[in-house]
A protein has these predicted regions:
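Residue-level signal for inorganic ion chemistry
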Residues: 22, 89, 129, 169
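Hydrophobic residues in well-ordered beta-strands that form the structural core
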Residues: 31-32, 86-87, 127
């Protein structure tokens, strides 16, 4: 095999800093969001939602336009075989990305809840960073009675980092507080932090409050 393509999910330096050296070593082309050309030096082609990137002879990745963490963020969805999501910094295991480096929480809500949450439950999640331990702790800070998150935290705190857990969307909906927007316990605890929150807040209100708390947690 050989490297022919470099896929950048977004423009942050920790995701693109190796582009130049990799291109020099392999001659690969750099692909990223169509609107990221002025942010990613040496980008060869821009990707639009719905485009397909072929890897090797058998893997096809659908491009998803997933703004929120930044406004030029893509995720890559593998439909062939077991579905998989390469989610960059939009969706983490048990969490979502921040929005203070070129993003917007209202947009991230629409991406995460109205787009990614609709992927098949057996979709494996491969994020750009492994923050699962800290994210599970935040979930339990917001929803202490979440027994699935309690059990999983105990497991991942002891796991071999070379055999790290891979979650799927079904599990994310149980452990990721940003998908648990109708949880009675989550809402009750939020209302202690935000006394003006309505008794029955909508999902976007809950998401934005959680994102605000997570910014300084």
């Amino acid at each position: 095999w050989r490297i022919t393509q470099i896929l950048n999910t977004h423009e942050h330096f920790d995701h693109i800093d190796g582009n130049q050296a990799m291109v020099a070593a392999t001659g690969a082309v750099v692909l990223a969001h169509a609107n990221a050309a002025d942010k990613i030096a040496g980008m060869d082609a821009g990707l639009q939602a719905g485009a397909t990137v072929t890897v090797g002879r058998s893997v096809a990745l659908e491009v998803l336009d997933t703004p929120g963490h930044t406004m030029s963020h893509i995720c890559l969805f593998k439909k062939t075989g077991i579905p998989a999501l390469f989610s960059g910094d939009t969706l983490f295991n048990a969490g979502v990305g921040h929005c203070h480096s070129g993003g917007a929480p209202e947009v991230l809500y629409r991406t995460a809840v109205e787009q990614l949450a609709g992927l098949p439950d057996n979709t494996m999640v491969y994020p750009g960073h492994d923050y699962i331990v800290n994210n599970l702790r935040f979930t339990l800070d917001r929803e202490p009675g979440n027994q699935v998150a309690q059990k999983l935290l105990a497991e991942v705190e002891r796991q071999d980092p070379n055999q790290a857990l891979i979650t799927d969307m079904a599990l994310e909906k149980q452990i990721n507080t940003f998908f648990r927007l109708d949880s009675v316990e989550v809402i009750a605890n939020l209302r202690r932090s935000f006394p003006d929150m309505p008794a029955n807040p909508g999902p976007e209100t809950v998401f934005l409050a959680l994102r605000q708390l997570r910014n300084s947690w």
